[in-house]
Amino acid sequence: GIPCGESCVFIPCITAAIGCSCKSKVCYRN
């Protein structure tokens, strides 16, 4: 539930490497 400061509209979350995932076009962690 914490925004990772990255969007995932056109590309996947690079922050997935630290546990972020794409939700509602924004990368979130927990």
Curated annotation (Swiss-Prot):
GO terms for biological process: defense response. It is found in: Secreted. Its main location: secreted. There is a cross-link at residues 1-30 (Cyclopeptide (Gly-Asn)). This is a cyclic peptide. It holds the Pfam family Cyclotide. Disulfide bonds join 4-20, 8-22, 13-27. Keywords: Disulfide bond, Knottin, Oxidation, Plant defense, Secreted. Probably participates in a plant defense mechanism. Belongs to the cyclotide family. Bracelet subfamily. This is Cyclotide cter-P. It comes from Clitoria ternatea (Butterfly pea).
